[in-house]
Design a protein with these regions (language model features):
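Single conserved hydrophobic/aromatic residue that forms the stacking wall/gate
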Residues: 1-9, 384-393
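Predominantly late transmembrane helices and immediately cytosolic-facing juxtamembrane segments
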Residues: 209, 227-369
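Hydrophobic core segments of alpha-helical transmembrane domains in multi-pass membrane transport
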Residues: 19-30, 74, 109, 190-195, ...
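Structural signature of hydrophobic alpha-helical transmembrane segments
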Residues: 63-72, 121-135, 178-188
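C-terminal ends of transmembrane helices
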Residues: 77-90, 139-148, 193-203, 356-364
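Transmembrane alpha-helix boundary signature
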Residues: 30-40, 78-89, 109-127
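Functional cores that coordinate and move charged inorganic groups
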Residues: 141-248
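Entry/N-cap segments of selected transmembrane alpha helices
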Residues: 83-111, 180-189, 323-348, 375-378
Length: 393
C-alpha cells in the first residue's frame, strides 16, 4: 500500500532527523563554554547501595550504553525475529549473504590495523575498527526512508547484528580480563526459562519482562559481556504467535459487529451501555490477536526513537575539536590503523565478501539491492562513534 509506505517513510525520516539534531547538539555542547561540565556529567557514577556496599555502580555513560541502549537492541532483535519467521530472512539462504558480508567487514579492518601495528605494543588494538555503530548506521539508512529497499534495510540490520555479535565475542574472549562464567551461566539459564515459557504458550508480558530484565540483562551486565547482547537474545525468546489466531478473531469480530448494529442507538452523542460493552470486547480481542512480539515492537519503538536514541547520541557524539586536528588521524600507527580500517577496510570487506559469495554462487543478491545500493550500505557501515575517543588516547 503506497500510503502505508509513505507513512513509514515519514517515520524513518523523523528518526533520522532526530538523530542528526542530537548529534549536532552533542557537538555544540562539546565545543562550548560548558564542555567540561558536559563531559563530567556523563562520567558521574550511579548505582545502588546494598548493606552499605555499592552495587552495580557504573558511570552514567555506561548506564546509557549498556542500559538504555539495551532497549534499542531489544527492538532490533524483535524486528529480526519477525523477519526470520515470515520476512526477508525466512529462507535461511537469505541470511548467508549478510552474515558473510559482516565477517568480511570484521576481518579486513582487523588485518589493516595489524599490518600497520604488527610488532608494536598496540597489536592488541586490532578489535577496535571491527565494530559498526548499528544505531547510527541504521539511522542514516532510515533517514532516506522508502528510497532504500526493504531488503537493503534487512540486509544492513542482519549485517550489523552479526557484526555486533562478532565484536562482543572478540571483547569477551580477547579484551575482557574478568569474565564471570557463573554470571554468564545464570544468564543463559534465564534465557532457557524464557524459551521454555514460550514453548509452553505463556504470553504474559510480566513473565518475559521479569526474566529478561531482572534475569538475563542483569546477569550479562555482571558477567563482563556487553549487556546489549542480552537484549537481542531475550528478544528472540518473545512469543511471535497471538493468543487467538486470525480465523477466530474474524469470527468474533463479525459476531460483535452484528451485536453492535442491533443495539438500539440513542439520540445523544454518548453510546448505549450495550454498545460500550461490545466495543470493549472488540478492543480486548484486538489486543490479544496481536502477537506479544509485535505489541512490544510497536510500543517500545517510539520510546527508542525519540528518547533513547537522542540521549545515546548526546552522550556519545560529543567531539571536542580544541585539541584535535586532522593531522592527529595520521600521527600514530594506532590512529592510522583505526581510521583506514574503518574508512577503507569496512566497505572493502563487506562489498568484497558479498561479491565473492555471489560470484561463487554460494549466495544470491536480492533483486532490489543493486551494486550502487551495496556500495552505499558498505560506505555507511563504517559509522563509528568511538573514533574520536580513540584518537585522544
Amino acid at each position: 500500500d503506497s500510503s502505508t509506505s509513505r507513512g513509514l517513510g515519514d517515520v524513518y525520516k523523523r528518526q533520522g532527523i532526530v538523530l542528526i539534531l542530537s548529534v549536532a547538539l552533542a557537538m555544540i555542547l562539546a565545543n562550548s563554554n560548558i564542555a567540561e561540565s558536559y563531559f563530567h556529567f556523563f562520567e558521574q557514577e550511579v548505582g545502588f547501595i546494598v548493606n552499605g556496599e555499592p552495587y552495580l555502580n557504573y558511570s552514567l555513560h555506561h548506564w546509557i550504553n549498556d542500559g538504555l541502549m539495551a532497549m534499542f537492541f531489544f527492538v532490533v532483535g524483535l524486528e529480526l525475529k519477525r523477519e526470520f519467521i515470515g520476512g526477508e530472512l525466512a529462507d535461511i539462504r537469505n541470511t548467508i549473504l549478510p552474515i558473510s558480508a559482516a565477517i568480511g567487514g570484521m576481518i579486513v579492518p582487523a588485518l589493516i590495523f595489524l599490518s600497520l601495528n604488527i610488532g608494536t605494543p598496540h597489536t592488541m588494538g586490532w578489535g577496535i575498527p571491527m565494530a559498526t555503530d548499528i544505531a547510527f548506521a541504521l539511522g542514516v539508512v532510515y533517514l532516506l526512508g522508502d528510497k532504500v529497499p526493504v531488503s537493503a534495510k534487512v540486509f544492513l540490520t542482519t549485517l550489523a547484528i552479526v557484526d555486533d555479535l562478532g565484536a562482543v565475542l572478540v571483547i569477551a574472549f580477547f579484551y575482557t580480563s574478568e569474565l564471570s562464567i557463573a554470571s554468564l551461566l545464570f544468564g543463559l539459564g534465564f534465557l532457557a526459562v524464557m524459551f521454555i515459557g514460550n514453548r509452553l504458550g505463556i504470553k504474559s508480558l510480566f513473565f518475559y519482562a521479569a526474566l529478561g530484565i531482572g534475569g538475563v540483562w542483569v546477569t550479562f551486565l555482571l558477567s563482563g559481556i556487553h549487556a546489549t547482547i542480552a537484549a537481542v537474545l531475550a528478544a528472540f525468546m518473545i512469543p511471535a504467535d497471538a493468543k487467538i489466531n486470525e480465523s477466530v478473531y474474524l469470527k468474533r469480530m463479525k459476531k460483535l459487529t452484528r451485536r453492535f448494529e442491533h443495539e438500539e442507538a440513542n439520540e445523544v452523542r454518548t453510546l448505549e451501555e450495550g454498545q460500550v460493552d461490545v466495543l470493549t470486547h472488540i478492543q480486548h480481542d484486538t489486543e490479544i490477536a496481536i502477537p506479544l512480539l509485535q505489541q512490544l515492537e510497536h510500543k517500545i519503538s517510539p520510546i527508542v526513537t525519540f528518547l533513547i536514541m537522542p540521549i545515546f547520541a548526546i552522550a556519545n557524539a560529543g567531539i571536542s575539536f580544541t585539541d584535535l586536528s586532522l593531522s592527529d588521524i595520521f600521527s600514530t600507527h594506532v590512529a592510522l590503523g583505526v581510521t583506514l580500517g574503518l574508512l577503507l577496510g569496512k566497505p572493502i570487506g563487506i562489498i568484497g565478501a558479498t561479491f565473492l559469495m555471489v560470484k561463487m554462487r554460494w549466495a544470491t543478491l536480492p533483486s532490489a539491492i543493486t551494486r550502487r545500493t551495496l556500495l552505499g550500505l558498505g560506505t555507511v557501515s563504517y559509522t563509528h562513534l568511538t573514533l574520536p575517543t580513540i584518537l585522544r588516547v
